[in-house]
């Protein structure tokens, strides 16, 4: 990559910083949630909406980001994404109520939704095809470092400054990134087909209303009638999308994707699997601080082994799947993740704190093998004309299921806690015990889906490269 022009290398640095900002923000908030709750005068049971609002917005906006970049230009959209993300960070830091913070996170999510996919498109357009893989490795490396630094950095800032600084640190980086984007990045555009606005609005309405309805009456503060209305609107929107997409060649996501059995199994398993996995990064730091009395910094450090395990497993996951096949790896890793989650809970309640980093490292390894296997299984048999659409749908489902997972985790805490998180330690431990038992059951359920995957031991699991795939 050293033989690339200096201007292209600078453009790759801009994209890399965008990836870093977005990935850092997905984990830096988790450690700060209990401190935020205390500062805002809210129950910790309601703080999951800070994560849900961001991740759900990313899921809703993802389908439009690539089309906007092609239509308006990658520089214009990437600049807009950085500005929105930075402005959202400023508003988050200034928020004095939970509602204000949630709205600011929505603005952040709009920027974050455009930053990563548009960054991938930028690399695709500025780098020669034979150097694309090396360039993508370079720009995605900061995106892998972000989740590693996020929990510890969040803990340091909360413990030695205040939670506001987890958002304020984005502002100078965002300003420099926005200026560099305007000065250095070319504004590539492409001829685009007409955007399926109707399909986009229907899917967005369905995802948003059904996810919010999961939060229930206590989380939203609405009557049963309004809650039923949300569910009805969400279901109607999804049914209308199916009717809209049937036989529609310009649909946002073609229904022909689901004629491929492997794609259908992979997407269904990914959706269900990531609901369970999405609970863990939210619940772990909350349990460590509220249930065990860890400081924010200590809780943040405890999350690092999970990320290290995830990064380490990526190096060998292809060999593992080639050796044992998708079905065995996915079923075993799904049941294993449920078991390790319970092992973490019982080790913590037994006071075996020295074992927790090892358990979290193992949890990260298992989670990484599931994620990689689910992604490749879903896309591996799609024809080239459906690969881009299938990859976009998978990306959207990944974000949606994570937001649902965090919502359900918050719902479980509320169900078992009943606003009594400040009682004696034994009662608090009981709340988290019941929550983790329920989570383990939810994490294990996708094994039923993965058990239907055809046995493919000995076949090559590597996906051939797609021109427009975002994977």
Curated annotation (Swiss-Prot):
**A Gene Ontology molecular-function term?**
transmembrane transporter activity
Q: Which UniProt keywords apply?
A: Cell inner membrane, Cell membrane, Membrane, Transmembrane, Transmembrane helix, Transport
Spans traversing the lipid bilayer: 12-32, 49-69, 77-97, 106-126, 138-158, 165-185, 195-215, 220-240, 263-283, 286-306, 342-362, 393-413, 431-451
Q: How does it sit in the membrane?
A: Multi-pass membrane protein
Coiled-coil positions: none
PANTHER family from the entry? BLR6921 PROTEIN, MAJOR FACILITATOR SUPERFAMILY MULTIDRUG TRANSPORTER MFSC
Q: What is this protein called?
A: Putative multidrug resistance protein MdtD
Recall the taxonomic lineage recorded for the source organism: Bacteria, Pseudomonadati, Pseudomonadota, Gammaproteobacteria, Enterobacterales
């Amino acid at each position: 990559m050293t033989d690339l022009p200096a201007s292209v290398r600078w453009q790759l640095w801009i994209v890399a910083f965008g990836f870093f900002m977005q990935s850092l923000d997905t984990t830096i908030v988790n450690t700060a949630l209990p401190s935020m709750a205390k500062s805002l005068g809210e129950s910790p049971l309601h703080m999951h909406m800070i994560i849900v609002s961001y991740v759900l917005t990313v899921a809703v906006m993802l389908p439009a980001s690539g089309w906007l970049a092609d239509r308006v230009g990658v520089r214009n959209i990437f600049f807009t994404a950085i500005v929105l993300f930075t402005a959202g960070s400023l508003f988050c830091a200034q928020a004095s109520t939970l509602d204000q913070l949630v709205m600011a996170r929505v603005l952040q999510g709009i920027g974050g939704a455009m930053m990563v996919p548009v960054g991938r498109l930028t690399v695709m357009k500025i780098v020669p095809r034979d150097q694309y893989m090396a360039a993508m490795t370079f720009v995605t490396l900061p995106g892998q470092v972000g989740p590693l630094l996020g929990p510890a950095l969040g803990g340091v800032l909360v413990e030695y400054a205040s939670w506001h600084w987890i958002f304020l640190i984005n502002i100078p980086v965002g300003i420099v990134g926005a200026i560099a984007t305007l000065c250095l990045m070319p504004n590539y555009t492409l001829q685009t087909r007409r955007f399926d606005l109707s399909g986009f609005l229907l899917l967005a309405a369905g995802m948003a209303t059904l996810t919010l309805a999961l939060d229930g009456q206590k989380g939203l503060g609405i009557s049963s009638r309004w809650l039923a209305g949300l569910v009805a609107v969400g279901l109607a929107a999804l049914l209308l999308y199916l009717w809209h997409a049937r036989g529609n060649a310009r649909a946002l996501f073609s229904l022909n994707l689901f004629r491929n059995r492997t794609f259908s199994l992979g997407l269904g398993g990914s959706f269900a699997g990531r609901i369970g996995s999405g609970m863990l990064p939210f619940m772990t730091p909350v349990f460590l601080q509220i249930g065990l009395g860890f400081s924010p910094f200590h809780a943040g450090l405890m999350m690092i082994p999970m990320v290290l395990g995830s990064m380490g497993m990526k190096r060998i996951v292809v060999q593992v799947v080639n050796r044992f096949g998708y079905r065995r790896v996915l079923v075993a890793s799904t049941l294993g993740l449920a078991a390790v989650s319970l092992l973490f809970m019982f080790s913590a309640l037994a006071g075996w704190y020295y074992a927790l980093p090892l358990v979290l490292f193992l949890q990260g390894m298992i989670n990484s093998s599931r994620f990689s296997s689910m992604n490749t299984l879903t896309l591996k048999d799609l024809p080239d004309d459906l690969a881009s659409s299938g990859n976009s749908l998978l990306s959207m489902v990944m974000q949606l299921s994570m937001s649902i997972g965090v919502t359900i985790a918050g719902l479980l805490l509320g169900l078992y806690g009943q606003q009594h998180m400040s009682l004696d330690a034994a009662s608090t431990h009981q709340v988290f015990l019941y929550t983790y038992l329920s989570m383990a059951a939810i994490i294990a359920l996708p094994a039923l889906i993965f058990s239907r995957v055809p046995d493919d031991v000995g076949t090559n699991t590597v996906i051939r490269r797609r021109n427009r795939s975002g994977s």
